[in-house]
């Protein structure tokens, strides 16, 4: 008996796989690719990256077979894939300006976008969210990126009766950071 509340269970009930595209094929996308062979109802239609050869290597190094990689459409420009039947775009360039331009094009084409681009989210997230509402699509942060993890911690704390006073991003750990104060923190950046 399958529990219906799990997203994976809901996904498995679909007749056709969700067609997705990645924009940027670096570390985060490679982590997804490492799990791709276990996902029956998600199909990678396209990968956009400025270095197509490296993107293909990342696919192979993440465990995709040569046969699967050959079926993926690779491009170095988002404009070349906008006419394809892609349901969800994952923007993972890490560049706030480029990421915002990509997300804007995707949203205006009436398709969903997942930002794995905290840089674009913190600089233009409100704009992109409003634009998505206007176009009746979803612009979401990716689970596993810093903003979504912070929100998860806030929700957990509130659900357990804690009053949230403050929440923020942790940074790379270094022993000297342990004794940082609001007055000394800026010296670390």
Feature-to-residue mapping (PLM):
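N-terminal Rossmann-like dinucleotide-binding module
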Residues: 1-62
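Short, ordered loop/turn segments at secondary-structure junctions
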Residues: 50-52, 94, 118-121, 143-145, ...
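Conserved N-terminal Rossmann-fold NAD(P) cofactor-binding segment
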Residues: 51-84
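Beta-loop-alpha module in the N-terminal Rossmann-like domain of NAD(P)-dependent dehydrogenases
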Residues: 75-108, 119-125
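Rossmann-fold NAD(P)-binding glycine/threonine-rich loop
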Residues: 98-105, 117-137, 143-145, 152-156
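A short hydrophobic/small-residue beta-strand
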Residues: 112-114
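Conserved anion/nucleotide-ligand pocket segment
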Residues: 152-189
């Amino acid at each position: 008996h399958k529990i219906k509340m799990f997203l994976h269970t809901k996904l498995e009930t679909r007749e056709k796989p969700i067609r997705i595209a990645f924009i940027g094929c670096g570390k985060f996308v490679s982590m997804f690719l490492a799990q791709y062979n276990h996902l029956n109802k998600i199909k990678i239609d396209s990968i956009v990256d400025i270095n197509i050869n490296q993107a293909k290597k990342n696919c192979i190094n993440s465990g995709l077979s040569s046969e699967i990689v050959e079926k993926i459409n690779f491009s170095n420009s988002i404009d070349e894939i906008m006419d394809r039947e892609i349901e969800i775009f994952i923007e993972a360039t890490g560049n706030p300006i480029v990421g915002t331009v990509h997300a804007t094009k995707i949203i205006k084409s009436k398709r969903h976008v997942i930002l794995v681009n905290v840089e674009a989210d913190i600089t233009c997230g409100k704009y992109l969210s409003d634009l998505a509402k206007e176009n009746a699509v979803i612009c979401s942060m990716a689970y596993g990126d810093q903003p979504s993890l912070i929100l998860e911690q806030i929700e957990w704390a509130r659900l357990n009766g804690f009053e949230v006073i403050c929440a923020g991003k942790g940074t790379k750990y270094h022993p000297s950071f342990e004794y940082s104060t609001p007055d000394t923190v800026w010296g670390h950046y």
